[in-house]
Each structure stands twice: as C-alpha cells, then as structure tokens.
Amino acid sequence: MVFRKLGEGDVAAYLEMATDFYNSPAVLHSIPQNYIENTAKAVLSGTPFADIYVFEENGAAIGYGLLAYTYSQEAGGTVCWLEEIYVRPEARGAGVGAAFIEFVKEAVFAARYRLEVEPDNTRVKALYRRHGFSPLAYESYVLENGKKQ
C-alpha cells in the first residue's frame, strides 16, 4: 500500500470517493459538489492549509485522507486535523485506515493530531483509541460565512 499526495491524474477518483464519503453515515450532512472540487483545486495549487493523500494498492485508488493544518497555542504548535479518512467499501476491514493514521503520525510533524467522529460510530472510535487518540471534552460550534472562497 502506498500513501501519496494527490496528483492531477487522481482527481476523478478523489471526486468520486469524496462524494461517496459525503453521502454516507460518516458525516452529519452532504455538502455541495463544488466544495469537493474546490478542495482538490486548492491542494493541487499548493495551499499550505491542506493535503490530500491517495491510498493506492496494486495501482488502484482505494481511499483518501484529507489533512488540514492550523496553529494552536493550547497545543503548543501546529495541529494536523485528520479531516477525512475514506476507504472504499471493498477495501474496508483490512487495516487501511489504521495504516494511514500511523503514516500521518510518522510523516507529518505536529504538536497535536486531531479528528472528529460521529457520536454513534463506535467502530471508528475504537480504531482511534487504539492509535492513541482520546476524546477532547470541548463542544464544537460553527458560524457559516456566506462568502465562500
């Protein structure tokens, strides 16, 4: 298995997988397709705020991971958000998500690694705990800006 950064030739597979992710129980709601497209464009243009990794096995894209970067005084430095981890249904249960988490911990330097999970997704919560994550007792709040980038 190879984890590599998104390239131009990966965009169609990424769009398909991200669309599937946002139409699954792993998220609270779907998002407009142009948000997914804009993320790919931003990453390919070299934004310093995000990376997309393609999970490749035997020449086929079997998943992706979206990372986002921020700075946190509370964490004492850079925070790497594991925003999305998606594995195609036929590749699930083979340790792909676990391998990606370990890859990120080794390849991406950060003072803190952070992620979110649906409250009832006990299987994924167990995976995260096995890899050293623990719950952070904050509630999250958002304010949507009508001016999209």
Report residues per predicted region.
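Conserved beta-strand-loop-alpha-helix junction that forms the acyl-donor binding cleft
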Residues: 92, 114-125, 142-148
